Structure formats: structure tokens, C-alpha cells
Amino acid sequence: MKIVDVLCTPGLTGFYFDDQRAIKKGAGHDGFTYTGSTVTEGFTQVRQKGESISVLLVLEDGQVAHGDCAAVQYSGAGGRDPLFLAKDFIPVIEKEIAPKLIGREITNFKPMAEEFDKMTVNGNRLHTAIRYGITQAILDAVAKTRKVTMAEVIRDEYNPGAEINAVPVFAQSGDDRYDNVDKMIIKEADVLPHALINNVEEKLGLKGEKLLEYVKWLRDRIIKLRVREDYAPIFHIDVYGTIGAAFDVDIKAMADYIQTLAEAAKPFHLRIEGPMDVEDRQKQMEAMRDLRAELDGRGVDAELVADEWCNTVEDVKFFTDNKAGHMVQIKTPDLGGVNNIADAIMYCKANGMGAYCGGTCNETNRSAEVTTNIGMACGARQVLAKPGMGVDEGMMIVKNEMNRVLALVGRRK
């Protein structure tokens, strides 16, 4: 099966591009927007619409394979690739990539994806968002050629012989950490709520007292609203380094506090993402490693999730090799090609580390569907309900795709 044409269409994402540097410099709020001047190159507003590019590969039998290029909310910040605007990058795909795809015979996913993921133009690698979308489209093309799901393609190439099963779906609330939890309970999210605990004084509490109260509220709310006794979601709270900030990155003090949270969460299991941020990769690994060892030594029913300083496949391997946490977030679309997601999850699994197939609120329904297939095929511990920050939409997209894949795979057994 050959690719006979490549089309690119501009699109919207499930959220927004925010100029992180402008926000950190004190951009003001005005309703849902920000006031003040932009700082990061490419931004025309501090908050502007999130943009995507759909890549459509027309196959010689008339089928169309589809992947979406998308970037994170804080595109252009923190050493990332430039702000991802469709008008800037559609010409790159049409000029540099499409000619290499048109006329190509579709073979296996892995070698084709790796070729385009590693491709350079004028000595530079392609934008991560382009690598993300192109490799999604290639995966869909291979699946359409073989007349199977994308999950089966990934399973056969990366995880041969494995069963394709449902994976727990993780919903995140953003700042609306009370009303959105009610939505999650009604729809029975498997993992919840994220909660966006990114400020010590306002959200964690100077001694952690505010988050402790929230965990107690969360526990009681689930018990009150659940319609069946055996609905027992995992608590996954992202604290953005605030526990380390409140407790001076003291391992024993942080462990004491997390132990208190774990007790308050019972009968539910607790995960804490990003307990500290020590602003250095090596030191971050060591702090996560030592805190995990302390919690495990005490037998605390809590897991740590690595986030800060764990961005690339190499970072994932580094944290995994050193047992720096119990789980790592596999960050899409920062990894570029979706082949890297499969590689990262399989490495985690082979080395006793939990793999969370994550992502961003600022991607699309299509990229969410594709990465859900990959998470299922590789046996991730959880997948993110995405895109958007409304809970309902992301859960619908991810859960429905999962159920479709399970039905199609089951039919072929």
C-alpha cells in the first residue's frame, strides 16, 4: 500500500497557548484572559487559541490516515521548541516532509516512525509537534493497511504476545478542584483529580494543612456520591514541587507529611506527582529516589510520580534506572514521535517502574485517541483523559476509544 497524497489542515486544540514567561512576570487576569505584554517570541496575546495541524495521508485504495500535530499549553517556554502556529508549520510539512511520504510503500510502523522522528531540515530536527502528528498518521496508515487497530500494530511491534486490555483513565480538574471532582465521581474516573496544587500558601498550606483538608474532603465526597460500594478510584495529586518548598526538601519531613496524606486518603490509594522541584536533573533524581526509599521503608501506602526534570526518553530511563519514584509521566507531545511513547512505556515496564501515558490539555481528540491505543498496547498503568480542562470531553474521547478498540480486538480473538 502506497501513500499517494498528503494534506494538511489547520485546527484548534482542546485548550490554549499561554505565554508562561509573561505570566511569571505578573500578567494580570481579565476574565478568562490575561492582560499585559507578551514576552515569548511568537505570542500576540498572553493567552491565545491553541492551534493544531491535521496531517492526512491519502492511501492508494482511497483510505485516509490521520494524525494531529499539537504542542503543550506553555509552548515556546522552558527550553521547548518555538510556539506552534499552524501558518508557520504547514509550509514546512508541505515542502520538506510531504515529498518524502508521497509514493512511499507502507511497511512497519517502527522504522517509518523513527525515520521521520529523527529527520532533520537544514541540520535541525523537526518541531516536536510535527514529529508527534506525522508519526500518528504513519501509525494509522499501517493500521489501515493491515486492517487492524492502531493498538494491535503497536502491540505486535513493541509488545508481542501481550493482551490488549482496558487501562485506568486519569481525569484532571485544573483549579476547579471541587465541582470537577463531582463530574469525575459521576462518570467513575479510575484515577483522580490532579487538583493543581501549585502554590504553597494558597493551595498546599504553609504546613500542608490545606491539601490535607482537601484529601479528607475528596475521600468523603467519593463515599457520599458513589453509586456502588466497589468504586474506589486512585487519588493522584500533582503538587508542582510545593511539598518540597514547604518542608525544605527534607526527606523525613516530606515522608511524614505524605504518610499523613496517605492515612487521610484511606480506604483509597494515593499518588503524589512532583513532590519537589530542586531545579537540577541529578538532584531531582536523587531526591525522588531517596523519598521513595523512605516511604517504602516505612511501608507507606503512597506512590510518587516523577514529573519535573523527567521529560525525554533518556530522562525516563535515568529516573527508572535509579528508582526515582514509583511511576513516571510519559509526556506527550514533548517526546515528539509517538514511537518514543511506546519505547518509554516498555522500558518502564521492563524495569519495574509504573508508566503513566500522559499528555496535555492542549492537544486534540485525534492525538488522544492515538496515544490511548499506544497506552493500551503497551500496558501503561494509566492514561490521561484529554484534551481540555472540562473533564467530560476528555473522558468521553479516551474512554470511548478504549471501548471501541477492546471490541474490535475481541472480535478477532
Curated annotation (Swiss-Prot):
Mg(2+) binds at residues 238, 273, 307. Changing residue 194 to R: It abolishes deaminase and aminase activities and does not show any major conformational changes. It is an enzyme of class 4 (lyase). Optimum temperature is 55 degrees Celsius. It retains only half of its original activity after a 30 minutes incubation period at 50 degrees Celsius. Changing residue 73 to A: It has very broad nucleophile scope and excellent regio- and diastereoselectivity in the amination reaction. This mutation strongly moves the specificity of MAL away from ammonia and towards methylamine. It is highly enantioselective. (2S,3S)-3-methyl-L-aspartate binds at residues 172, 329, 360-361. Optimum pH is 9.7. One of its GO terms (biological process) is glutamate catabolic process via L-citramalate. Changing residue 331 to R: It abolishes deaminase and aminase activities and does not show any major conformational changes. PANTHER family: O-SUCCINYLBENZOATE SYNTHASE (PTHR48073:SF2), O-SUCCINYLBENZOATE SYNTHASE-RELATED (PTHR48073). Belongs to the methylaspartate ammonia-lyase family. This is Methylaspartate ammonia-lyase.
